[in-house]
Curated annotation (Swiss-Prot):
Family, per entry: Belongs to the universal ribosomal protein uL1 family.
Keyword ATP-binding: no
GO MF entries: rRNA binding; structural constituent of ribosome; tRNA binding
Entry function: Binds directly to 23S rRNA. Probably involved in E site tRNA release.
GO terms under biological process: regulation of translation; translation
Domain of life: Archaea
UniProt protein name: Large ribosomal subunit protein uL1
Keywords: Repressor, Ribonucleoprotein, Ribosomal protein, RNA-binding, rRNA-binding, Translation regulation, tRNA-binding
Subunit-structure text: Part of the 50S ribosomal subunit.
PROSITE patterns: RIBOSOMAL_L1
Amino acid sequence: MVEKTILEAVKKVVEESPKRNFSESVDLAINLKNLDMNQPKNRVDEEVILPHGLGKELKIGVFAKGDVGLKAKAAGAAYVISDVELEELAADKNRARVLANECDLFIAETQFMPIIGKNLGIVLGPRGKMPIPLMPNKDVGELIQSKQNAVKLRSKDRLTFHVAVGRRDMNPEDLAENIETIMSRLERVLDKGKHNLRTVYVTTTMGKSERVV
């Protein structure tokens, strides 16, 4: 059972925002307080699995070869980058930037990680898209599926940051449950829990916003 105030805020934002000819993202605008963000321990850097996903297919790039590459493709990876293609990307930073902008996230077999760090870190690092290492005992298909429902809560050194919680055409109850999942994680990781939350607003990409905290 989702909290009534969150559900009402979601419904109001979805119903009262002007209709668009595309499916808008629904986001949370999170404002923290009473934290020194110059201290790394106060920064939020969490991955949260949303119970109802984001309402869209994420574009995932996988650095892999052989059977792992084939399994990644079968599991829905948008791009599978072999060791040969990785060398080509390392020599063509413009192409690497295009790929980095197209993909929502990357996964890489562990043997690829040092090469990626050395040659593509300058492209992927600032975008927060350094690959998730695929450990030898992990199934690439399962990892891809879990990441389809995951979002990153990342404040960096700012008190204000945003995170997507779904799409406007999703069921309001599902959006509200996604929001509750994020709020619960935030309250757990913040030093003083909900007392470090100044405000939290739910908003659409180009529409109105409603306060939930």
